[in-house]
Amino acid sequence: FRETDIVGFINDLMQTFNYQAQKKNITFTFEKELEGADSLKVWIDLNNFDKVLMNVLSNAFKYTHEGGNIEVSLKTGHNDAYRSALKDYFEIDITDNGIGIDKNKIEQIFERFYQIDNDMTQSNFGTGIGLHLSRSLVELHHGIIKAENRKDGQGTHFIIRLPLGSNHLKAEELENPEETGSEPTISQLPKDSIYET
């Protein structure tokens, strides 16, 4: 785990979807609720956390019709109801106005090999392990990920919450950037991500 500016991390990652956004004429935006700050330092595993967002965003683009909207938002929060590591957290929300998910199957999407079954997926099959991988990686970050349908019935809302700070991490999990060089960009990260569900 390394201390990273999550704002820059998300911006770099979103650029990899610019072509898809243009091709489907999808409005793709990033909103920050950081009380005027332009950056937010968090501790993440730079070799794996990109897979979490790439999997969720890939599904958002897959199931959002042409001319639709996909929004990524970032904020921080505090909740005493959470276990100690998550009392102070940062949250990444990914919201689309796509086809949504059957409310009776919404929890199943994180199960290994589960695939959504609808008209849009008949010619667009995936492996069924993308979101399962995302949940596993989020849990390794001591966080939570959940999905819900939007209250207006127009699409899906994914919520990813991870702890702020590094007190929840073991000493051997912390990486010193001075020992490994400068902070890598998304283009330098491993390309073995699994993007589909």
Roles of regions detected by a PLM:
Residues 19, 99-100:
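Glycine-rich G1-box
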Residues 142-148:
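Glycine-rich ATP-binding loops of the HATPase_c
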Residues 37-44:
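Conserved micro-motifs of the catalytic ATP-binding
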Residues 125, 130, 134:
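Short alpha-helical Gxxx[C/S/T] motif in the catalytic ATP-binding
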Residues 60-61:
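Short helix-loop "hinge" at the ATP-lid/N-box region of the Bergerat-fold HATPase_c
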Residues 2-15, 27, 50:
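A conserved beta-strand-to-alpha-helix junction within the catalytic ATP-binding
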Residues 101-113:
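Short conserved segment of the HATPase_c
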